[in-house]
């Protein structure tokens, strides 16, 4: 007879004989929430917190899906939408959207300058327009200034902005000439010009009144020879350009004496050009009116003024042949225009016959490149002269005060 097992062994055998429960697969967090809800094993506050955490996790995993309602966060609107509204302290405040266009058009600087009465020369000097570079060595950056200018028009006469030679009673836009112009124009050199005899003088006065011509003009003249050996020079062509190199005046001139040497190989002028040339008196009057009250630029200007038959105030002349900064380029007392063009501007001129328009443009370029030096030298020269005269009481109140202290 087998021994009887204790009660503890009997319990153990029953547990071993009983079927073992199978392990269930892990359920998801969402299924656990549902099971907990059905069994009411968690509170409503905990459920709400878990739901918000689950929603945030889903939003993080899918950023393209936007939440339906978010009171705690503010959304930014693009500038094209309507102004947003935000409640602060019970008041509704509008936030206007600002839209800025990076490509907004600014008013023209030249239009503004015209309204303020500022000349184009002063504008170009202030903004360093035109010439670039500070070295005196040759530079190709100066070449486009000449190449981009329109070609010279020989014997075109007066070519002011708005002037048309085919319509002497009106300008290019059909506007009538002003009727309040004086009948005569007295120049500083003593010449008295009758403005009723030529339309050019009336147009020049009109351009001066409207500040069309500007402050600076550059001149160059071509001469031919008269006398037994052709040594005496007389005027045969005169050209004038403005501060920007634009042609203002160009005319062939009928010589006042019999020509014995046309100097065609240099001047480019021959007898055939005289068929359409203007009289010396007409050219002299027009040029004198153009230069009145303006600063004259040129190379060795003394010879140009001699053949024109009038003078110009010395303090209003900027001569590239006499500028101290250019003396180092000359092999004598003064350098030639051809040497200055090559050494200072890096361009070649006078390869053949001369062009007075080109020479006037080169002289203006030389002046513009060293304008500050020209102005300083001119100011020092004539201020010193005034100071010496001021020693006798001509210096104004300062001279009188010194006299009283002695």
UniProtKB/Swiss-Prot annotation:
Basic and acidic residues composition bias: residue spans: 377-387
CDD domains assigned: REX4_like (cd06144)
EC primary class: hydrolase
Domain Exonuclease, residue spans: 216-367
GO molecular function, one term: nucleic acid binding
Location of this chain's protein in the cell: Nucleus
Compositionally biased tracts (Gly residues): 388-398
InterPro entries: Exonuclease_RNaseT/DNA_pol3 (IPR013520), REX4_DEDDh_dom (IPR037431), REXO1/3/4-like (IPR047021), RNaseH-like_sf (IPR012337), RNaseH_sf (IPR036397)
Keywords: Exonuclease, Hydrolase, Nuclease, Nucleus, rRNA processing
A Pfam family it matches: RNase_T
GO biological process: RNA processing; rRNA processing
Biased amino acid composition, Low complexity: 54-64, 72-82, 94-108
Biased composition (Polar residues): 1-10, 162-173
Top-level division of the source organism's lineage: Eukaryota
Stretch list, region Disordered: 1-108, 156-181, 377-406
A cellular component annotation (GO) from this entry: nucleus
Xref: Gene3D superfamilies: Ribonuclease H-like superfamily/Ribonuclease H
The EC number(s) this enzyme carries: 3.1.-.-
Similarity field: Belongs to the REXO4 family.
Role description: Exoribonuclease involved in ribosome biosynthesis. Involved in the processing of ITS1, the internal transcribed spacer localized between the 18S and 5.8S rRNAs.
Protein name: RNA exonuclease 4
Species: Neurospora crassa (strain ATCC 24698 / 74-OR23-1A / CBS 708.71 / DSM 1257 / FGSC 987)
Lineage: Eukaryota, Fungi, Dikarya, Ascomycota, Pezizomycotina
């Amino acid at each position: 007879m087998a021994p009887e097992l204790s009660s503890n062994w009997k319990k153990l055998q029953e547990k071993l004989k009983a079927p073992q429960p199978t392990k269930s697969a892990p359920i998801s967090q969402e299924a656990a929430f549902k099971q907990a809800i059905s069994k009411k094993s968690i509170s409503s506050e905990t459920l709400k917190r878990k739901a918000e955490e689950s929603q945030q996790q889903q939003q993080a995993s899918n950023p393209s899906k936007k939440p339906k309602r978010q009171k705690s966060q503010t959304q930014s609107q693009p500038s094209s939408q309507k102004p947003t509204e935000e409640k602060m302290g019970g008041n509704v405040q509008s936030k206007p959207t600002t839209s800025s266009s990076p490509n907004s058009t600014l008013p023209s600087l030249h239009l503004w300058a015209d309204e303020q009465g500022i000349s184009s020369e002063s504008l170009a000097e202030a903004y360093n327009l035109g010439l670039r570079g500070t070295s005196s060595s040759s530079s190709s950056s100066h070449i486009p200034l000449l190449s981009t200018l329109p070609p010279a028009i020989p014997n075109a006469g007066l070519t002011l902005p708005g002037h048309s030679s085919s319509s002497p009673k009106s300008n290019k836009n059909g506007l009538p000439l002003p009727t309040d112009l004086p009948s005569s124009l007295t120049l500083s050199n003593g010449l008295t010009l009758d403005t009723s005899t030529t339309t050019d003088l009336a147009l020049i006065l009109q351009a001066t009144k409207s500040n069309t011509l500007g402050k600076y003009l550059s001149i160059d003249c071509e001469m031919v020879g008269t006398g037994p050996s052709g040594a005496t020079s007389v005027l045969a062509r005169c050209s004038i350009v403005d501060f920007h190199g634009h042609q203002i005046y160009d005319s062939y001139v009928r010589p006042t004496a019999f020509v014995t040497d046309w100097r065609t190989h240099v001047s480019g002028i021959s007898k055939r050009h005289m068929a359409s040339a203007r009289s010396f008196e007409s050219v002299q009057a027009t040029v004198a009116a153009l230069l009145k009250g303006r600063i004259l630029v040129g190379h060795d200007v003394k010879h140009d003024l001699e053949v024109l038959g009038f003078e110009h105030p010395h303090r209003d002349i900027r001569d590239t042949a006499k500028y101290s900064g250019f003396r180092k380029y000359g092999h004598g007392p003064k350098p030639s225009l051809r040497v200055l063009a090559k050494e200072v501007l890096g361009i070649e001129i006078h390869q053949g016959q001369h062009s007075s328009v080109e020479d006037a443009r080169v002289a203006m370029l030389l002046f513009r490149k060293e304008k500050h030096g020209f102005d300083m030298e001119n100011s020092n020269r004539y201020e010193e002269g005034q100071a010496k005269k001021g020693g006798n009481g001509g210096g104004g109140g300062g001279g009188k005060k010194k006299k009283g202290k002695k």
